[in-house]
């Protein structure tokens, strides 16, 4: 499962955001919003700001996270608004996707696992995007020096260009790098990819 340090880090952050009423989309969620369509899987959804907004725009959303407090907040908002969001608390360290989605989102998630699990999850995401659908993936990469939210030896910083390379054969709709200042003299370095899975070839065609 995700380590206690990570769970505590995000639960504290979620509780602060709820108490302060801060539910704005972050820059990566803002970027993702216009690419969401159809059935959406939001892995590591946090407080569900993107899931809720996607549902308001007509998507049907499955929102998954390891934080019970975050899931409770999503259920409350979705129920009050009559929104098509199903929110479930799961152990993301062992979770397997069981159906295809038009859009699969994993913003700020994969780096919280050792390399083998991070790459396994990425392949699971790719394998469960419907043909013609999109994967939206955002990770921390090498060059990140703010590591307070990680358990030592229990995280993975992707290499520069690695995320893009792992979507070889897909159409890259967005590919970008962003650096953000973090507490102290440290930085968070991100890579974001929005990629469209190829359509299946028509029967009888190569």
Q: What is the role of each PLM region?
A:
Residues 43:
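Conserved beta-strand/loop positions that form the S-adenosyl-L-methionine
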Residues 1-37, 46-99, 113-120, 124, ...:
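Class I (Rossmann-like) S-adenosyl-L-methionine-dependent methyltransferase catalytic domain
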Residues 105:
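A conserved beta-strand element that flanks and buttresses the S-adenosyl-L-methionine
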Residues 108-112:
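Short catalytic micro-motifs in class I SAM-dependent methyltransferases
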